[in-house]
Amino acid sequence: MSTLVESPVPSNDSQAAAPAAYDPTQKQKSQAKTARIPIKVVAAEKLKKPEWIRVRAAAPGSRFYDIKRILREHNLHTVCEEASCPNIGECFGKGTATFMIMGDKCTRRCPFCDVGHGRPDPLDTQEPENLARTIAALKLSYVVITSVDRDDLRDGGAAHFVECIAKVREYSPDTRIEVLVPDFRGRLDRALHILNSGPPDVMNHNLETVPRLYKQARPGSDYAHSLKLLAEFKKLHPEVPTKSGLMLGLGETDEEILQVMRDMREHNVDMLTIGQYLQPSEHHLPVLRYVHPDTFAMFEREAYAMGFTHAAVGAMVRSSYHADQQAHAAGVN
């Protein structure tokens, strides 16, 4: 495990141990990424994974390698690969993936996330076409499109999302599209205006954790702003289900999670996902607890009691894991 401490101001004596010169054009992963955030990860005792944490490998004869080949041929990224999702074997094996647009370099440095940080490359104008062709070739009936944060773009990438949605609908008119968007912080009004021209079938934005832990887990993000994004989109598109997700194990309490769920419902969020945080590497935020299945079951009961139309809750649940089944259960056909 690891602990978190505020970064001290380096003294002359510590300059020899300073990290290597930062090259913003290179994708920073793991230690290189987390070395330059205000909260540092310090190695400590590691919690043993309980028996209910089980990752499914790709089955023999599955489409795992076929999917990887197709993605590389079309110059596409998936959050499954970039974020080291534990469910990648199962999802790729079944021929599903969550597509990550606008490159593989994020402008944020969230220390729970394994997506690389760096100065993003210019947008690929061929990406919407490549994405649409790939989805059509795979004959997918439901897709999730997400992205890195693009704080370098005036609209946060909203127009690129709309272009991708339009192209997918052109090639696959019966395919349902869920988007998992960044927070568009500082660009919310512009982004929402752009999304009006081509809204998705499901609008997803993850709160990730409780507000008390935002400084450690989501530097550069704001809890109230993320709730506002979901609420404002819902006002503009009341017919489109909204969705958000949380990860457990960063030091939150059960009551804090329940309060976030109440906040979601007060902001008209329809669908919920809750899963166990798993540390991508020793340089990321530590797992401070492994949540028992009985506790996940309690959160699921409470979610339906609060009025969520669908709640996917469990240790291995991720925001886009079985997203098609989640959406179908919530009435998206």
From Swiss-Prot:
Q: Where is the composition biased (Polar residues)?
A: 1-15
Could you tell me what the cofactor note in this record states? Binds 2 [4Fe-4S] clusters per subunit. One cluster is coordinated with 3 cysteines and an exchangeable S-adenosyl-L-methionine.
Can you give the residue ranges of the Radical SAM core domain? 91-309
Give UniProt keywords alphabetically: 4Fe-4S, Cytoplasm, Iron, Iron-sulfur, Metal-binding, S-adenosyl-L-methionine, Transferase
The EC category is: transferase
Q: What is its main location?
A: cytoplasm
Name the lineage: Bacteria, Pseudomonadati, Pseudomonadota, Betaproteobacteria, Burkholderiales
* Name of protein: Lipoyl synthase
- Mind telling me which PANTHER family this protein's record contains? LIPOYL SYNTHASE, LIPOYL SYNTHASE, MITOCHONDRIAL
SUPFAM superfamilies named among the record's database cross-references: Radical SAM enzymes
Compartments, record wording: Cytoplasm
Query: What does the similarity note say?
Result: Belongs to the radical SAM superfamily. Lipoyl synthase family.
The UniProt annotation places [4Fe-4S] cluster 1 binding at 80, 85, 91, 320
